[in-house]
Amino acid sequence: MKSLIKMSQAVAAASLLFISATAVAVPITTLYSAGVDDSGAPLSLGANEQHYEIVAGSPSIFTPVVTSHSAYMPSDASSSWISLPSGFSSATYQTTFDLTGFDVSSASLDLKIAVDNTITDVLINGVSTGFSIVFGYPAFQSWSNLTVSNNFLAGVNTLQFLAVNSGGPGAFRVEASGNATAVSEPSLGVLFGLGLMWLAMTRKRKA
């Protein structure tokens, strides 16, 4: 009996090690930067934005287009500027991403944000991050960085950027990346454990 208990404990420990070893952080592939297509390639100037929309509550009221301005830091292969509609003094840029199959406690987003003119907050699933970008040339000539590491949901998550334009052209840009640990398949750990137990019992009989 004691040997069986020890064997079970050893199998359980080995199974946990197996599951831990297979828990690796991977990119969140449903999170996109502004101004790119589904493959991550930059959209052409004037093209409709594919992953961010401007909302006033729900539903969406405007699809931004890829834009450019000589005063802005240039768009590149990773992201592009998207426009604020003429006459809008404020707008909420919104995107969603899916954490189905991931451990939400392990998720983390790295966001590089620029805006013309200001960001008053960034919300993850309606919860404030306390992040803001103040009015001034640095707002659209350099990046402001934000890391989000909590308030995630299993399934679809909503990310919102609250922007204000103080006159003239308005635009927004974000380079977004993230990673999370995929949820381990319990069946793999169980099969691994059963295999160890069978091997141990076989050796015990032979002995």
Label the predicted regions.
Residues 103-122, 159:
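Aromatic-lined ligand-binding clefts that engage carbohydrates, nucleic acids, or primary amines
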